[in-house]
């Protein structure tokens, strides 16, 4: 049985851990509130640019563009959004597991795919498995701006435009609520889903439709990446908040259990001392 000193040491250590996890929970809650607002604020912009792009692409004249048309697939790109830090429950492991299983199922050779990764956790995961990472970015702020992601987004879209990739998929955690995040797979390029937009507005084009699409489509694809990043950041903070809350609750439960054990051990020690004193007194009589 553990000594009173050992139990007391464990209680003090667990209390310190509880204080740390509680502080991290509060920090994550604050970050989540702002990240959630950022993600929600970006939705109207995305809805409007999607409407405009769809109308330009599918309007009168039916202009075609390489970013809108499916082509034979020789190489696939995977854009994976993870975090730079851990302590976020299954936030990273869920999305990485899905990507890894998908790649193993679809491809027989590393020559058939390449990975663009956002976040140190994902970068470490793929490098340890010798999987081809063609682009990466780490150390993004907790509340990233479009400027923070613009360069890698531009390069990612460029890899499809120059024929390096024939299709591009994006994997991230979609924010549903503070207690629910869903791993999401989205086909980023080609933009074949624009045909699903039923709303139509007639535009007069100046310059030509094709020239407008040359500018609009890359911007739209880059905006999709940024929108997914905002979504993923909200999910990250929510997952970390939940993980730290669970850790705090578990620590407090352990403290209660250890305190009970400490009191029982202390009571047993006192009882033993009293018994020995009484026995000694009786022996003297």
UniProtKB/Swiss-Prot annotation:
One of its GO terms (cellular component) is proton-transporting ATP synthase complex. SUPFAM superfamilies: ATP synthase (F1-ATPase), gamma subunit (SSF52943). This is ATP synthase gamma chain. F-type ATPases have 2 components, CF(1) - the catalytic core - and CF(0) - the membrane proton channel. CF(1) has five subunits: alpha(3), beta(3), gamma(1), delta(1), epsilon(1). CF(0) has three main subunits: a, b and c. Pfam families: ATP-synt. Coiled coil: none annotated. Signal peptide: none annotated. Disulfide bonds: none annotated. GO terms for biological process: proton motive force-driven plasma membrane ATP synthesis. GO terms for molecular function: ATP binding; proton-transporting ATP synthase activity, rotational mechanism. The gene is atpG. Belongs to the ATPase gamma chain family. PROSITE patterns: ATPASE_GAMMA (PS00153). Produces ATP from ADP in the presence of a proton gradient across the membrane. The gamma chain is believed to be important in regulating ATPase activity and the flow of protons through the CF(0) complex. Keywords: ATP synthesis, Cell membrane, CF(1), Hydrogen ion transport, Ion transport, Membrane, Transport. It is a peripheral membrane protein. It is found in: Cell membrane. It comes from Geobacillus kaustophilus (strain HTA426).
């Amino acid at each position: 049985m553990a000594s009173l000193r050992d139990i007391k040491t464990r209680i003090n250590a667990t209390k310190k851990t509880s204080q740390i996890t509680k502080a991290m929970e509060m920090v994550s809650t604050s970050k989540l509130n702002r990240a959630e607002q950022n993600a929600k604020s970006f939705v109207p912009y995305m809805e409007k640019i999607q409407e405009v792009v769809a109308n330009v692409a599918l309007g009168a004249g039916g202009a075609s563009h390489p970013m809108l048309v499916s082509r034979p697939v020789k190489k696939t790109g995977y854009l994976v959004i993870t975090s730079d830090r851990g302590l976020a429950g299954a936030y990273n492991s869920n999305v990485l597991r899905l990507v890894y299983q998908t790649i193993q199922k679809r491809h027989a050779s590393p020559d058939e795919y390449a990975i663009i990764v956002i976040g140190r956790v994902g970068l470490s995961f793929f490098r340890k498995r010798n999987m081809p990472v063609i682009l990466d970015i780490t150390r993004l702020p907790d509340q990233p701006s479009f400027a923070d992601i613009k360069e890698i987004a531009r390069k990612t879209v460029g890899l499809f435009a120059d024929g390096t990739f024939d299709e591009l998929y994006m994997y991230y955690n979609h924010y549903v609520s503070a207690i629910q995040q869903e791993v999401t797979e989205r086909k980023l390029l080609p933009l074949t889903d624009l045909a699903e937009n039923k709303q139509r507005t007639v535009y007069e084009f100046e310059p030509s439709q094709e020239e407008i699409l040359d500018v609009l489509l890359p911007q739209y694809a880059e905006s999709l990446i940024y929108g997914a990043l905002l979504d993923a950041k909200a999910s990250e903070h929510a997952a970390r908040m939940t993980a730290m809350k669970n850790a705090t609750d578990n620590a407090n439960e352990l403290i209660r259990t250890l305190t009970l054990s400490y009191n029982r051990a202390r009571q047993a020690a006192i009882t033993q001392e009293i018994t020995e004193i009484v026995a000694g007194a009786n022996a003297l009589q």
